UniProtKB/Swiss-Prot annotation:
Capsid proteins VP20, VP24, and VP25 form a capsid enclosing the viral positive strand RNA genome. Together they form an icosahedral capsid pseudo T=3 with a diameter of approximately 30 nm (Potential). Specific enzymatic cleavages in vivo by the P1 encoded 3C-like protease yield mature proteins. It comes from Cherry rasp leaf virus (isolate Potato/United States) (CRLV). Residues 350-366 have a biased composition (Polar residues). One of its GO terms (cellular component) is host cell plasmodesma. It comes from the Viruses. Keywords: Capsid protein, Host cell junction, Transport, Viral movement protein, Virion. This is RNA2 polyprotein. GO terms for biological process: transport of virus in host, cell to cell. The record marks Q374, G375, G592, Q593, E767, G768 as: Cleavage.
């Protein structure tokens, strides 16, 4: 039962019994009066709610919303200006409105579409709109000023469209679009009228923030990635009504009226050519050519500004920094349009060095990310043609399982043949499965000395591990992590490098800086308590002669410098290497990641020798020449390609490290030097004038710098290359007698572009712009000596990209080549085969014969092929009937035959420590030679469109 109450609750008192306070009564009367006035005003209005709310003389000026901007006349007669000189009146920064060229993912894309935010008003300006009575409009015209950043006369046509992010249907999302020519003499103002923007109070903010610009460029050629093409400046929205009272109405009845606005001023424009010399002038209103149907995707629906690869929810262009994780990786995974920067980035034309954390230096550990130490696979065409071999071997395990299920139904079960005590990779991910210990002494700290080496196959073959995990590796790619632990006192410091030696080119007890400097790896100081990086184990597939999985290679720890304080170095120090599994990928094969001469990122991994600096108050400076053409005792894949290029361009990514004691300090400036400039001593005042920022050596011992491409000569060559300086203007303070060491490693070249070719310049004009065109034949083997001619019989040639004549493999005495010609093996095919570990694809051979006279050319030449490998490169007396499974007949002067990749394995080796025809050759060729009247015999070879190399090996400089 509810208890009795003596009085009512406040909410139970009727309103008629309440006593209204003076303030509440005044507010109520004012509200009632305002409502009556609003009703009377609406009743007296001569037009409906769809029109402007307010008196007939109320009009909005652009200054009320967007501030004072340039007049249309000034914009019309202004010239295209540089990116940094663009000044706009819109509150958004011009940097956020710049449209930059974004290289498409593939070369097949006919258009380049760039999405940028549509400039919109701020909350303060929206409030002013509401106060003015701007409630709704059925017709809104939009004017945008466009600043072109390309050269006058550049034939670059662009389409600008406004899209709605609330839908993913392109036909529904596209609001309005129009064309403009960025190479026009006066490309500054475009007008996109007849846009229906429902600017009511409910969805005003959501709709405006959901709009974005889609700029689509046609026939973009020759621009570097991230190049600024144009900028959108001030934007004006005008409300228009089709009434006599609207004195500012520009509403048009048809598109013909809209196009007629472009004919108000008659003048011609330049359409082709980078300058006015020999330019072709055409009419301004020339008909736009048919560019075909547009195909573009909508930005996914989102709240606010659409999320794209270039935008954030705040409408700011995203400049993604490459965050450096603690562990580095050798796996290649190149995001599109990625901008890389390490802890510091040399990012302006004045070479100013800025930091990434708001100008503050940090002492947090940032290890390098060793992405794909082997480099991308080499593919020699822009169009990838699938072959039967690819379909059969793209994923052997999945294909077999699918076949069994199709034959016997889904209930069939595949039994495991692995022992029960084995562990799969999934159970090992993230766990340390092997720990190895070693030690070294002070006398071992010699440049290039291997302090500890571990064979990968020994790890995978250990007890309770090998069977199942090894089976997964043979069917895919395994990513492992190695962590180095070194215990030393804080006063001792020296440089080290963890090296992934896939082909075991470094002996466990070797001292060879030449090989260690070009093998993929990561550098770190000894004062790091732990350092790790990831490496990717590559499997060439199952093969009958694949012995003991020796291709997995070794992990080696190499010394790069001597200790800074030899007296403080203990007699013996301990090393611990821990191994764990990061990931297992069953994707075993693809056709590569791009062209040799046009790569977003090309791994280099060239380590320079240490520069030693003594402590003291005097000026100290370490200089590194970044001449990647310069060959040491060994060189790698990147240098092999550079050897055939007249020059290259690209941004350099450089890891740097300074090894010193914990008590050492000093101000360090990292200074890039271009165009062969030399500085014997750089003053600190000059560095500060150039806006360089110093680093405290006690807080910054290592990092990564991004060195943009800059050259007055247009490219880096053997004689024109940049330098990197480490300047200590105030000297180095530290323990007496200390010697610090500065180390750098050129990790990658971004936006790599090869220029010219040293050997094939006369041929390139007829073969296209690609110097590595697979249409070119390369003289691969040479001319026979006179005493070897007219013997008849068969010439045996194992199918391999290696120049077997230069190696003198199995040639014997019956088939001898001219030594002067055989030594000229400087062609890219032999270089790439020598600097890589595996190959696959089609090779085409052509035998050419010249005779003493035409009467001797009486018999057609014949080529035979067999899948059986013959360990012979030279004369063979084998009978014709025993030679091959396929043959082809040419004419009396030449015969050509193409050999597809028919070996029952995913890849073949180039060669390891020694050339092995049984693991390196795709069968054998036999050429039936003439018996008399022969003057010379030459053999040519070329790689076809499906040819590619994989993985990494170091090559001796003398073996070319």
């Amino acid at each position: 039962m509810e208890p009795e109450r003596s009085q009512l609750a406040p909410e139970e008192v009727p309103d008629s019994f309440r006593v209204e306070t003076p303030a509440a009564m005044l507010a109520r009367l004012r509200a009632e009066s305002a409502a009556k006035k609003e009703a009377a005003r609406r009743a007296a209005m001569p037009y409906n709610d769809d029109l402007l709310v307010g008196s007939e003389l109320t009009y909005l000026a652009k200054d009320d919303v967007f501030g004072c901007g340039r007049s249309a006349l000034k914009r019309l007669f202004s010239r295209p200006s540089a990116e940094e000189n663009v000044v706009v009146s819109h509150p958004l920064s011009v940097k956020e409105q710049v449209v930059r060229y974004q290289r498409p993912r593939t070369d097949h894309d006919p258009y380049v579409a760039v999405y940028t935010p549509l400039p919109h008003i701020t909350e303060e300006q929206a409030r002013k709109l509401m106060e003015k009575g701007f409630s709704n409009s059925s017709n809104v015209a939009l004017d945008m000023a466009v600043q072109s950043h390309v050269g006058q006369g550049t034939p670059l046509l662009a389409m600008c469209g406004i899209m709605d992010s609330r839908t993913d249907d392109p036909n529904e999302a596209l609001q309005v679009a129009g064309y403009f020519d960025l190479g026009r003499d006066r490309c500054d103002l475009i007008s996109l009228p007849l846009i229906n923007f429902p600017l009511n109070k409910e969805d005003f903010d959501d709709y405006m923030r959901g709009l974005y610009l889609c700029t689509m460029f046609h026939n973009v050629r020759g621009f570097q990635n991230n190049k600024a093409l144009c900028s959108y400046s001030a934007v004006g929205f005008d409300q228009h009504k089709e009434t006599p009272r609207c004195i500012r109405s520009r509403v048009k009845e048809s598109w013909e009226d809209i196009l007629a606005r472009n004919n108000e001023n008659e003048f011609s424009r330049v359409q082709s050519g980078q300058n006015l010399l020999n330019a072709i002038e055409k009419e301004r209103n020339e008909a736009i050519p048919d560019v075909g149907a547009h195909q573009f995707a909508c930005v996914p629906p989102s709240k606010g500004t659409p999320q794209t690869s270039l935008l954030t929810s705040d409408g700011v262009i995203k400049r993604p920094n490459f965050t450096l994780p603690r562990s580095a990786s050798t796996r290649f995974n190149m995001p599109l349009n990625m901008r890389y920067s390490g802890r510091n980035s040399v990012d302006t034309a004045r070479h100013s060095l800025t930091t990434n954390s708001g100008g503050r230096s940090t002492s947090l550990r940032q290890d390098p990310n060793l992405l794909e130490g082997q480099g991308p696979s080499i593919d020699f065409t822009k169009i990838i043609f699938p072959t039967v071999v690819e379909r059969n071997f793209s994923n052997p395990r999945a294909e077999i399982v699918n076949t069994i299920k199709q034959l016997y139904g889904d209930t069939v079960e595949t039994l495991s043949v692995n022992p029960p005590e084995s562990y799969s990779a999934e159970r090992l991910i993230g766990r340390v499965f092997s720990t190895l210990h070693g030690s070294f002494g002070a006398t071992d700290l010699v440049e290039g000395k291997v302090l500890m080496s571990v064979k990968i196959v020994d790890l995978l073959s250990s007890a309770n591990l090998g069977a199942l995990l090894l089976a997964e590796v043979l069917g895919g790619n395994l990513t492992m992590r190695v962590t180095a632990l070194i215990t030393l006192n804080k006063y001792t410091s020296f440089a080290l490098k963890l090296v992934y030696d896939e082909l075991a080119q470094l002996a466990p007890d070797a001292t060879n800086f030449g090989v260690a400097s070009v093998l993929p790896g990561a550098i770190f100081p000894s004062q790091e308590k732990s350092f790790s990086f990831d490496f990717n184990i590559f499997s060439m597939g199952s093969y009958i002669n694949f012995k003991e999985n020796e291709g997995f290679g070794r992990i080696s720890l190499v010394a790069l410098s001597s200790p800074n304080l030899p007296d403080q170095m203990p007699d013996s120090a301990n090393i611990t290497l821990e191994f764990s599994v990061v990931n297992v990928d069953t994707s075993v094969y693809n056709l590569g990641q791009g062209q040799c001469l046009d790569l977003d990122r090309f791994p280099v991994h060239v380590t320079s020798k240490s520069k030693a600096l003594s402590g003291g108050a005097k000026h100290a400076q370490a200089e590194f020449s970044l001449n990647l053409y310069e060959l040491g005792p060994h060189f790698n894949r990147f240098q092999a390609i550079c050897g055939h290029l007249a020059g290259y361009s690209g941004d350099l990514i450089i890891d740097w490290m300074i090894s010193a004691s914990a008590l050492t300090n000093g101000r360090c400036y990292i200074v890039p030097v271009y165009d062969q400039n030399t500085f014997s001593e750089v003053s600190e005042e000059k560095l500060r004038q150039c806006k360089y920022v110093s680093k405290e050596l006690s807080l910054n011992r290592s990092g990564t710098v991004h060195m943009p491409f800059s050259s007055s000569f247009g490219s880096y060559t053997k004689n024109k290359y940049p330098k990197l300086l480490f300047v200590f203007p105030g000297g180095i303070s530290g323990p007496s007698g200390e010697t610090i060491h500065v180390n750098i490693q050129v990790r990658d070249v971004l936006h790599f572009s090869g220029l010219g070719h040293q050997l094939l310049k006369p041929i390139l004009a007829a073969e296209g712009p690609d110097p590595f065109s697979f249409h070119l034949f390369y003289l691969h083997c040479g001319t026979l000596k006179t005493e070897s001619l007219n013997k008849g019989g068969m010439w045996c040639v194992p199918v391999s990209p290696i120049n077997l004549a230069a190696m003198k493999h199995g040639t014997g005495s019956s088939l001898v080549f001219n030594e002067s010609f055989v030594s000229k093996t400087h062609n890219w095919l032999h270089y790439m085969a020598s600097c890589t570990a595996y190959w696959r694809g089609t090779l085409t051979y052509e035998l050419r014969v010249t005779y003493n006279s035409r009467v001797n050319a009486v018999a057609n030449l014949v080529a035979f092929y067999t899948s059986q490998v013959e360990d012979l490169f030279g004369f063979s007396d084998k009978a014709v009937g025993d030679t091959g499974i396929a043959s082809i007949c040419g004419d009396a002067f030449s015969v050509r035959i193409s050999i597809p990749f028919v070996t029952p394995t995913l890849w073949l080796r180039t060669y390891r420590n020694a050339y092995d025809v049984f693991t390196s050759c795709n069968g054998s060729l036999y050429f039936h030679l003439p018996t008399s009247g022969v003057k010379s015999v030459q053999l040519f070879v070329r790689a076809e469109s499906d040819f590619s190399f994989e993985r990494f090996r170091a090559l001796k400089a003398e073996y070319t």
